[in-house]
A protein has these predicted regions:
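Solvent-exposed soluble domains appended to multi-pass membrane proteins
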Residues: 1-346
Length: 348
């Protein structure tokens, strides 16, 4: 590559908590990584190829980071520059207890990727800030889902004057794909910098967590990866609260329990379980049993009650007020992971 395509990413990686993130999918299946992150549940206890958003969550409510933080006064929001019904997110986010969902249909989108299939991510800076500003004097959790870096990646040459030039792929078609991909995530890296600047300017205590939901395919194998595993991406963080840098390799279902633990938040059935039992010998067996009880069993954990019912998800901003100090947790799912490009691509 002619230059580092993700300098903002690498700066955050050097200065704030980071690590590898083991995810359940490669090449596609964003919703399943998303499900693990938001609920603290593991996809290994579901059927092969299953999407919980389209199966169990169609009619069953599910405790999540949104419902847990709502219990302590947070407003909870989703922002996504794609259609609301993709992966049945409009229903799933209600079942997981979110307050609002701002999707592509509610945004003034004017810029698209060069091949025209996805909106660019720059619009998400303004929409994320709108979510944070929608609840005055209240803490907020915002889950922002990006889409600009998503495939398909064209085999024909689309970019006539790319900001980042790529060479060394086995074929011209493969080189075109990688050059397109790298330039799209270069723009996403600009979004990262702009988002951090925007939330820092607000002057509230804020933690930003960003993670890759899956690697692209494009012929990748474990031997191509620095991590040695195509099911590992990276997560990065930022905060303006003086939190220490604590690097750790995690699974997607452990990510938010780690972040909330660092922030002094110990809410929720699943997240508290990860915080207290992650190093125990019975951890995975207990995790499987707990998931079954909450999703398919009699909910003995809740004494048989429905403690986290679905919300009336609003496709608009509603104002809620609570007399608490404002602290913000923003989670951004980045649909890319440059850190683990093949070794050929990492050569600058």
């Amino acid at each position: 590559m002619s230059e580092d395509p993700i300098p903002n990413f690498h700066n955050l990686e050097s200065n704030y908590s980071t690590g590898y993130l083991t995810v359940p999918v490669v090449g596609a299946g964003t919703a399943n990584t998303e499900f693990e992150v938001l609920t603290g549940m593991s996809m290994q206890y579901f059927g092969t190829g299953e999407y919980p958003y389209k199966t169990i969550l169609k009619q069953t409510d599910c405790e999540s980071i949104a419902s847990d933080l709502s219990k302590i006064g947070y407003g909870t929001h989703v922002v996504h520059n794609n259609t609301a019904t993709f992966y049945s997110r409009n229903n799933a986010f209600s079942m997981m207890g979110f307050d609002t969902f701002t999707s592509k249909e509610l945004m003034n989108i004017t810029q698209y990727t060069p091949n025209g299939n996805w909106p660019t991510d720059d619009v998400l800076v303004q929409e994320t800030v709108k979510a944070l500003d929608s609840t005055k004097d209240q803490s907020d959790f915002v889950y922002t889902i990006t889409v600009e870096g998503h495939g398909d990646y064209p085999t024909e040459k689309i970019l006539t004057d790319p900001a980042i030039r790529v060479s060394g792929a086995a074929t011209e078609e493969s080189n075109n794909q990688w050059e397109y991909y790298v330039n799209m995530i270069h723009e996403v890296d600009d979004f990262i910098g702009d988002l951090i600047t925007a939330v820092d300017r607000r002057g509230e205590d804020t933690i930003v967590v960003m993670f890759g939901d899956h690697l692209p395919t494009m012929g990748l194998s474990d031997s191509d990866m620095k991590s040695g595993d195509i099911f590992k991406t990276k997560y990065i963080t930022w905060n303006n609260m003086g939190l220490p840098k604590e690097d750790a390799d995690l699974t997607a279902y452990q990510l938010l329990s780690q972040i909330t633990d660092q922030a002094g938040i110990h809410e929720g059935t699943m997240f508290s379980y990860h915080q207290t039992q992650r190093n125990s010998e019975t951890y995975l067996n207990g995790l499987e049993n707990l998931q079954y009880d909450l999703l398919y069993g009699k909910r003995y954990t809740y004494s048989g009650e429905d403690l986290y019912p679905a919300t009336d998800l609003r496709w608009m901003w509603r104002m809620l007020r609570f007399p608490i100090s404002a602290k913000t947790l923003t989670v951004t799912s980045l649909l890319f992971m440059v850190q683990d490009l093949p070794r050929m691509q990492r050569s600058l």
